[in-house]
């Protein structure tokens, strides 16, 4: 069987790879020991069961029951007796149990567990052939590349089994190709932690967050809830669709930005010109502003800041309904971006009657995907050029050095001019930063954030109108930073919060957006300081395995990296990041020494740092919370063994206490219940 290709992040960190694991088997038939000086079958079933239970997750009684089967020569232990690690193998071998053996088998290993799971996907073993086959995500999309090809041995032999001379033809297996993604593991950690916090706080039905490079279209991080753990298989199959591009939804007022851009391009938007807010009666349905009564006659610019529904309907009238639809199409809605490889949903521009046309102006009736929204939004920061989002950097074979695919920045179209893009961005700035902003809860101290909030009613799954309940909303925010020259776009959305629903309604997704954006900007060294080093060169990790400890420390430090030694020895036997990988300056490189294992001071470490420690030392670490390490159960310098378990607690340095007294902190389309109730009746 060929080795399956690996999946890497943008910095060369392994996200999925093959590892050798072991399956536990037991010979229980006495006949196996015939003519043997040493027993080859299980002799003491009770003692064997007792010892094995300390390694595999089975009770001694359950193991003993299996060992006591009649008429069986050899038995296995089900799923609990498979996927055993090398450390498990060593522990069992030290027990010297007669009749017990471990068979090697290849398994797919996902070192980070629940981590960009719907993007990376999962490979599963065919129970009949033993082959790994991609079942979801990149593992499935690029399965033909990752799988490689089998080897073979052909020859001619006679009836006695003798091989004829010069007939043997051997074909070596071809190793699978590697897939390199655009995601950054560090930013992915920020996303995973933020979403975990949102689930704990709000218990939503659906939740997602995505980070995109505003200047290249590269997806730097993406995750969703519910999700699954590809390493353990927990919750796998609970939700198959990748919400980034396979599920559509009505976006709400984040969609207003594209109608605004069309109106500016057509000369219909005059920021100082006043219009009448409040409500409109369309086809027997009353469509109101989110506060039901509007604000009287107000300037168009203030109407956009307030996220007025009547403003967007007014602009549609000025542009013309059919022409407005064509503008949405220019922004890429109603069709696939053709950049996501498999099963991308096109969405639909709802335009069959006047009611749909008018409600589409504020993001109802029309359906989209997050990747379409990101593509359209990118036009505002690239002189009117839309960038196609992409998440695969390359597909290449490490043996042959042949490259089969290379991702690159692609312009998907130019719907608007540079001047229009700049004018839209100015309005996005006012939405968040003006004195009359209703989105102040998305501001981040020291960073210049701009963007657009969204609140939409959620379509009922059976197609009958909209979901009912105390908080039947999809809340979202599409934001970028720093303004005028954004580095990243962060888009987060949450549907149907079941807990703290009033807070979810008022604060939207700010408790996810803010830590993701702030941590990402800090990580990329942009924002607060005037020196933008976001384009700084990556540091290449040196090869220090086998070196003297002090020499290794000096060599790592010379690359502007932070060496952290683990152990009491004087020589380095392993390092957490492979030599040659490129990482951002000041990244931690863990160096495992010979001698006794000792506990490092993990204060301030990220989850990724702790996971790297776990992978390097094979010591189990239980993680609790999110942010940075604030407590560890074993003190610094204490000796460790592989039997130890370490509890590590995290807390965020970005505790969000910046709540606002503004009752409409996320209220761009709040209380549209009047208009939506009427619309439900008319649909």
Question: What role is predicted for each listed range?
Answer:
Residues 446, 460, 492-683:
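Ligand-recognition elements built from short beta-strands and adjacent flexible loops
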Residues 164-207:
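Conserved, well-ordered alpha-helix/loop/beta-strand core segments that scaffold catalytic motifs
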Residues 81-95, 101-118, 122, 393, ...:
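Conserved SxxK-family serine transpeptidase/carboxypeptidase catalytic domain
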Residues 27-41, 49-52, 73-82, 105, ...:
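Second-shell loop/turn segments in exported
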Residues 47-54, 68-175, 492, 511:
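Small/polar-residue-rich segments within soluble enzyme cores
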Residues 3-56:
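Juxtamembrane extramembrane loops of integral membrane proteins
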Residues 16, 158-167, 207, 212-252, ...:
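Beta-lactam-recognizing serine transpeptidase/beta-lactamase-like catalytic domain environment
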Residues 2, 39-46, 82-86, 132, ...:
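Soluble non-cytosolic domains of exported or imported proteins
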